[in-house]
């Protein structure tokens, strides 16, 4: 999946998508020995999200909540189907970083008021752009965009939007000590970023997403 962001590779999605999409990764406890540190450092979150998507194999990609499977053809084609869609929601993030601590605001608004029957949820993830794991049992020593934590909870925060109203959520977060002191992985705090998205919890469709880098 990582090669989809590398120009010149056969899996590259193209500049039209490269500049606008957000990729995040949840880690799993199988098929290997269950010793992936990016899974072990937040088992509850990784299990909750994998179970939500009913994921039972890896690698396994979802695009805006749609199952894109494990085939490289759909990894390339599925994101392109959303290029002409117009979103009804807007998300903007702004913040600062001091060492391993970040503070930021997520601002949201909607064109339409949320129907009472619709279950929309806000997810806000802290993510690191690159993690080096030289001792990886499966030989994949460089990992991109693993989710560290979900700041609105593993099942998100329910939101009801009123058209024309701006909603703000504020966060201050520090890198967990397990990540800072882990002997088997390395990363740079300049690679920290926050990713926020609004998701229809029933259909799994992601209605809007944005991210902010703290480098």
Where are these regions (language model features)?
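Local sequence-structure signature of Cys/Sec-based thiol-disulfide redox active-site neighborhoods
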Residues: 1-28
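Short, conserved sequence motifs used for protein processing/export or organelle targeting and
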Residues: 22-215
